[in-house]
Amino acid sequence: MSREAGSCRVGTGARARSRKPKKPHYIPRPWGKPYNYKCFQCPFTCLEKSHLYNHMKYSLCKDSLSLLLDSPDWACRRGSTTPRPHAPTPDRPGESDPGRQPQGARPTGAAPAPDLVVADIHSLHCGGGPKSRAKGSPGPPPPVARATRKGPGPSGLLPESWKPGMGGDPRGVGAGDMASAGPEGSVPCYPPPAPGEFPEAHSLHLSLLGVNYPLSPGLFSYLGPSLAAAAHVPFLASASPLLPPATAFPAVQPPQRPTPAPRLYYPLLLEHTLGLPAGKAALAKAPVSPRSPSGTPAPGLLKVPVPGLGPWPRVTPRDPGQEGELERAAQSDPRRRLSLGSRLELPKASPSLTRFCSRSSLPTGSSVMLWPEDGDPGGPETPGPEGPLPLQPRGPVPGSPEHVGEDLTRALGDYARVEQRLGQLGPAGGLAPRPLREQLGKIRLELLTIHQALEQAVRPPDAPLDLSVKRAPAKGPQALGEAWGRPELGPVLTGGTPEPPGMLGPAAPQPFSGHTTKCEADSSVPPPGLPLAAPDDPVIPGSGWGTCVATRSSQTPEAVCGLQSPQGAEV
């Protein structure tokens, strides 16, 4: 059906402008109100489905209000002509499409024509003058005259919240009705008002900490002065129409406790651990960081001791007896450390993993060997360079002197750090920890004496270690005992590249027990990518499997086969 045939039924009033683009005869929703329908190619949104239908049907995106208001033609007329909101109500279904209703069939009280100045603005924008209308239909009155002609028609149908404010002052309207009141009593719908004109946004607080969270001025001060203002809403790219200016935020009451200083909150840690006030803790924090070694933990946190540090730091005031003890401890510490030339510089958990991997590649041994103590294998019981590593058939159990000496060394390190903290915090915090420091010094001297006695007890002789001496009776075959007791094994272990302590410790030969547990049977299998080494293979430095290769390289092939055979089998 042609357009002429379709427009014949409409009437003579609409036939004259049937081929012309339809005017936007409605105002979209006021800014700030929810919407149900939105155009997908322009910012038009409305609560009425028929309005969006007309918008899409007549391709009104180029004529929509949001685009019209941006034009310079509308910018010069904005002060004189201000559109009134027209209520989209279901009582007037014919007005959603004015082309399907004759002009003479309008209610008498209603304003004649589409009751908006937007049509005139559109006509001025596109054609440069009022549109030619059907004969007999009066032209649109001026806005001032239209304001006086309000009858019981459209203004009676307006919802209560959409009526313009009666006071005339936009600031006199309540904040809840600000967005819903008409443009004569408030800010216009489009474009969104300036941040200072919309008072409802003054209660909006968006920050990283949540909505309506009180923002203190120095909360984001660690970002710098330029970023501190933008840090309140970093997640909104175009937050300028939503946020008020910086003066719109109400002045936050200063809290009783000041905002923590932005240096990683170390004064808070000191305050919680040592019970200092916040200001004194911030003063006491300053001399701690430059003097402490590179591996020391945060000040005030004395949870995990670090045994791999250098000599213990010296405290400020001390009597000569304690100074001498500290010097001896500082001299004995590097000697113990430097005996291990290739000791891995790893975190504390890594040597235990290395120890477990190297032991899992050993031949089958006792279960006490597979699950040793929790101490650090690079502990202070390691001897000096004058003798090789003491290899014991059984790993040190928790009651052994090695374990006790390791615990004593950790306790000594803890006491040294506590004394250092107290010596540095004493003048700054105004405390007097002199009695506590003296008592800690006495305890540390006693621990040092016990530790040195234990170290002298476990120090091996200077001769090469004779591995034929066993503490447990040999239950395995005699050939294996002879193979393990060869004197060439000592030079293989002591000469060459020094291994990390976790690597060398498991290489001690274990007498085979009568039965094999599942864990030992699993650990007797070599790694899948590494075949069994021939007797002339070199020692792989730094790997746990190389220790076993070095151990087997000085043995006969029969002994190597006996190591990999089940325990009940004959060699």
Swiss-Prot record:
Pfam families: zf-C2H2_7. It comes from Homo sapiens (Human). This is Proline-rich protein 35. Residues 380-399 have a biased composition (Pro residues). Residues 165-175 have a biased composition (Gly residues). Residues 316-336 have a biased composition (Basic and acidic residues). Residues 1-27, 79-187, 286-402, 476-571 are annotated as: Disordered. Residues 16-26 have a biased composition (Basic residues). InterPro entries: ZNF750, ZNF750_Znf. Residues 351-367 have a biased composition (Polar residues).
